[in-house]
Amino acid sequence: MARIGDGGDLLKCSFCGKSQKQVKKLIAGPGVYICDECIDLCNEIIEEELADADDVKLDELPKPIEIREFLEGYVIGQDTAKRTLAVAVYNHYKRIQAGEKGRDSRHEPVELTKSNILMLGPTGCGKTYLAQTLAKMLNVPFAIADATALTEAGYVGEDVENILLKLIQAADYDVKRAETGIIYIDEVDKIARKSENPSITRDVSGEGVQQALLKILEGTQASVPPQGGRKHPHQEFIQIDTTNVLFIVAGAFAGLEKIIYERVGKRGLGFGAEVRSKAEIDTTDHFAEVMPEDLIKFGLIPEFIGRLPVVASVTNLDRESLVKILSEPKNALVKQYTRLFEMDGVELEFTDDALEAIADQAIHRGTGARGLRAIMEEVLLPVMYDIPSRDDVAKVVVTKETVQDNVLPTIVPRKPSRTERRDKSA
């Protein structure tokens, strides 16, 4: 295509009939011309049709029970967190739907505000995986950001707007679709300020980042550099409204349980008070009793906590839960490795005590569910190296001794076929 400038015969738009002098730009195709005004009109029509399609999707939003049931198929345990997330996500997208209808009818009686989510719990217990599975179910753009890489504007590091760029990229640069996506910010406990009292010196990677995140968490029209990095005065920006972006902010918050225990322990004073030992509190979900004052003591600023009204906590996974994670979900590790061995024509089997031994190792290492794959790789590496070059193996059996004592898995040889036996005897 060629742009038509001034000079020569007076050309007209093939759609609206305006001459090239009446419009800013006239673009030529094979025998036709279109002006910039008609292009803008076409874009508006397409955007309206896409918005209608999005409304249909919101009308079909699954109910909280359906969301929880979907999560059950992929994530073991963490029932309280699943319920909390299911309700929060359902209400969030219902709020978007109400906003769309209210904008069309101009008489929405109540303005519904956003409820972002704070997830607390040890590493390797499913926080990230829960958020990923939710986004997968809802078919919305999803981006993960690391809070430790962020710094306040003007300092070395990433600006908070780069988080929004990841979401836009996940939506294939469809800004309208990105505006209803989910952003998961991990390691948020690492941006806690260094002390409970405000510091005189700048805390550019702690309190400064919390301050910078406030606006996008609440909802604002943000300017995002299309290539990431720092903003430059002469570059064009992508404008994105974060009002309908759901933020799930998560962290391990190591040490927060001590703050909670100090506060909860004070209840056990005076006659008739319920006294609980530290061991009794530790066996329960201590994060379930978290209060805003605990998070402020930990180092989050009150304004930041106020923008995260929904709190979901995950608990440490015990041996039983880890064994279930290995074998029960739709994409369980045992099923994945069984499929890999099937592709080489070999059956793979884990004994029950082998799965328990793998779970025990993950608990011992303190890596939770995240460490299960590494242990499986260590256990299966010798046979995964050897078996593709062999044609005499029918089955591999992984036992408790294989996991605990580094003994090679039991290899069951394949019985030769009649043809092979006949050829051998000949």
UniProtKB/Swiss-Prot annotation:
InterPro entries on file: AAA+_ATPase, ATP-dep_Clp_protease_ClpX, ATPase_AAA_core, Clp_ATPase_C, Clp_protease_ATP-bd_su_ClpX, ClpX_bact, P-loop_NTPase, Znf_CppX_C4
Pfam families xref list: AAA_2, ClpB_D2-small, zf-C4_ClpX
GO biological process: cell division; proteolysis involved in protein catabolic process
Record has tRNA processing as a keyword: no
Keywords: ATP-binding, Chaperone, Metal-binding, Nucleotide-binding, Zinc
SUPFAM superfamilies xrefs: Glucocorticoid receptor-like (DNA-binding domain), P-loop containing nucleoside triphosphate hydrolases
Domain ClpX-type ZB per the UniProt entry, residue ranges: 1-54
Gene3D superfamilies for the chain: 1.10.8.60, ClpX chaperone, C4-type zinc finger domain, P-loop containing nucleotide triphosphate hydrolases
Subunit organization: Component of the ClpX-ClpP complex. Forms a hexameric ring that, in the presence of ATP, binds to fourteen ClpP subunits assembled into a disk-like structure with a central cavity, resembling the structure of eukaryotic proteasomes.
HAMAP family: ClpX
PANTHER family xrefs: ATP-DEPENDENT CLP PROTEASE ATP-BINDING SUBUNIT CLPX-LIKE, MITOCHONDRIAL, ATP-DEPENDENT CLP PROTEASE ATP-BINDING SUBUNIT CLPX-LIKE, MITOCHONDRIAL-RELATED
Name of the featured protein: ATP-dependent Clp protease ATP-binding subunit ClpX
Species, as recorded: Mycolicibacterium paratuberculosis (strain ATCC BAA-968 / K-10) (Mycobacterium paratuberculosis)
Name of the encoding gene: clpX
